[in-house]
Amino acid sequence: MSRKINDTFDACFWEEYLESQGSRLPPLPDVQRITPRVVRVLAGNPGGFQLQGTNTYLVGSGREKILIDTGQGLPVWIDHIAQVVAENDLKIVAALITHWHGDHTGGVPDLLVHFPHLKSAIYKNQPDRGQQDILDGQVFQVEGATIRALHTPGHAVDHMCFVLEEEQAIFTGDNVLGHGFTVVEDLGAYTNSLGIMNDQGCQIGYPAHGVVITDMPAKMAEYRDQRLRRERQVISALRESRQKNAGRGSITVQEVVQSVHGTVPEDVSKKALEPFMQEVLLKLAGDRKVAFELQGGVKRWFIVGNRV
């Protein structure tokens, strides 16, 4: 399934992400109790972009539960949720949404049909009409679960993660996945959000896609190293251009892609690699490591001074 993350990025391709999809993903059960206070319910929407499907979670050790995310809106998801609630005499008291993408919000209408008491208890940063706002640092509690909200934009402007204090665990949303890497809307904001997530000191990660992350510090280091590797590749391309050409040796984002990746199909470059490299360049510009000049209305990028 292809969907737009921003105005330029068609999320049908991202190199490391799709490489991870080429491997065999471990199967996940439709419903699984992961710990005494966390039950995972798959949304029934497996695919190249959603991995085994969107993970939704029922959280709490008592009768009352907090739901995290609502899947894509497929009937199988609400059927599983309703079955778990009925068989265990549970009550969902609130639903927390990690971000606006349809594979996380699509189940809200079905949820309200089955559980109309939740009409005033759907929480989301930058809420839709009738929903409640989630503030950074806001705390939600049920028996056995204290959930603290973190505003962590980058993958999406409204992205929230949720720390489960009792388990030293974090619901990572789409910021960190159980397999491979995520797509990013704003790399500068995303980099800052990774730092916020890492600072929580959580050991376990419950992602919105993929398996449980059993070593969160190691996973965060993996994500940091991947981002830094991409920055080094871009810097290397700009440095090589400056060495080969007179003046600043400025080059276009298309030329950066060609330097880093070689010759790739035009649609792959336009739809995926160029928007991603543009985000890397903008992040480096924010760090004052690179800048651009306009030539014929086209941005040409170069290294700033001798900073790198």
From Swiss-Prot:
Enzyme Commission code(s) on record: 3.1.2.-
Binding positions for Zn(2+) 1 per the UniProt entry: H99, H101
Entry-linked Gene3D superfamilies: Ribonuclease Z/Hydroxyacylglutathione hydrolase-like (3.60.15.10), Winged helix-like DNA-binding domain superfamily/Winged helix DNA-binding domain (1.10.10.10)
Sequence similarity: Belongs to the metallo-beta-lactamase superfamily.
Lineage: Eukaryota, Fungi, Dikarya, Ascomycota, Pezizomycotina
Pathway entry: Secondary metabolite biosynthesis
Keywords: Hydrolase, Metal-binding, Zinc
A molecular function GO annotation: metal ion binding
Binding-site residues, Zn(2+) 2: D103, H104
Any GO BP annotation: secondary metabolite biosynthetic process
Protein name as catalogued: Atrochrysone carboxyl ACP thioesterase
InterPro entries, sorted: LACTB2-like_MBL-fold, Metallo-B-lactamas, RibonucZ/Hydroxyglut_hydro, Sec-metab_biosynth-thioest, WH-like_DNA-bd_sf
Origin: domain of life: Eukaryota
Cofactor(s) required, per the database record: Zn(2+)
Catalytic activity: atrochrysone carboxyl-[ACP] + H2O = atrochrysone carboxylate + holo-[ACP] + H(+)
PANTHER family in the record: ENDORIBONUCLEASE LACTB2 (PTHR23131:SF0)
Function: Atrochrysone carboxyl ACP thioesterase; part of the gene cluster that mediates the biosynthesis of physcion, a natural anthraquinone fungicide that can prevent plant fungal infections. The pathway begins with the polyketide synthase AcPKS that condenses 8 malonyl-CoA units to synthesize atrochrysone thioester which is released from the synthase by the atrochrysone carboxyl ACP thioesterase AcTE that breaks the thioester bond and leads to free atrochrysone carboxylic acid. Spontaneous decarboxylation of atrochrysone carboxylic acid leads to the formation of atrochrysone.
Gene name for this UniProt entry: AcTE
